[in-house]
Amino acid sequence: MKYETQLFGGQANLHCMKQILHNAKSNSHGCIRLAICIATAFAVFMLTACSDGNGTKSFRSSDEAIREYHGFLTNLRQSDKVTIQSLAKTINEWRVLDDSVSSCISRDTVRKAHSYPFGTYRELNDSIHIELCRMAMSKQRTFHDLLYLREQTSSHVGDEELQQAVKEAQPFFASLDSLPIYNKGGKQAVLKRYLLFLQKSAKQGIHGKEDLLAFIKEEHLYFKSFLQYLPDFADDDIGDIRRNTEHCCREILRAADRKDLSHKDAMIYLSMRTNHRLLRNAQAAIEDLNSGRVKDEHTMHAYLLMMMQPFMTMDDLSVSVLSDKDKADLYKIADALPKEMDGLAKKLHLDKQRLSDMPMLMMKIYVTRL
């Protein structure tokens, strides 16, 4: 299993949401456009793993492969209003077929990008993507459906090496929620301690797995205290937290580049760390909204996006490293979102139907990128 690192942003999520929302209008069209932009551009991690390229079909010629691919497209065009289970199954079948077809035509002796069979393959591939998107949009979808599709069609499904590494890391992350909350001195003291810790960690760097675990553990201690004051930070500039968090994460990747830390550990632990934070952010947002702690519309907009953020930003690796508990928690958030969004729609005068269509838009973006 090979891991590659790409540039990613840190996460002081409320600040990011505030910056995004600064120029956003509170009408429904603005909300939808904003969410699409976030789903396509705002990413905490961009993590990729290489496919082995193996399929289950074998073709004797490019002609045979293209005919099979065309037949698959024809069958898709006859499908309508499919269940999410059927859509997931179809996507997985297409991936196997696509690997086989692309592998077969890559052996073709005539390699002309815009001619047969390569040009035909690309045209069919584009048409299949269009049909899969149509199928995704053929019925009303929920956040539960979106998570199910992401889970079932992840490119890491069946990766035993990854699952073993995740299993070994789970006890460490499970222990984080038992850490005490240290909020002595109020919100400004909490913010100051958090920032000092990040600055110190960025300066010292990460020099091995032991340093990585120590950083994640202590960071979560300050982050957990920070969440207690989340609504109170709505009007505060916490850009220093975001920038120093990014710096610390870059130090982890530099440690992997120096081979002080394996790329596998860097990617898995960073993904699991981010999952943990996204979940706790969304849970805190729901709790704060239900307790009446969120009063102003500006913060409500931010909280709306915070609740949806896990479904916008998690990539294949992030979904694949979710523990059973975190996965169950994420499904609970998915099931709670319709009610929470309905309540916010009334308070913020948003179009409820357009908000309810958000999972479909996110699903379309996901399928388009397959």
Where do the model's predicted regions map?
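Long, low-complexity or tandemly repetitive, helically biased scaffold regions used
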Residues: 106-134, 141-154, 186, 225-236, ...
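Intrinsically disordered, low-complexity segments enriched in Gly and acidic/Ser/Thr residues
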Residues: 274-334
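C-terminal motif of bacterial Sec signal peptides marking the signal peptidase cleavage site
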Residues: 46-49
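Coil residues (strongly favoring Ser/Thr
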Residues: 86, 99-100, 108-109, 127, ...
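Immediate post-signal-peptide N-terminus of mature secreted/exported proteins
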Residues: 53-92, 151, 158-194, 203, ...
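Short Gly/Ser/Thr- and charged-rich N-terminal loops/segments
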Residues: 8-11
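A cross-kingdom marker for long, charged
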Residues: 332-370
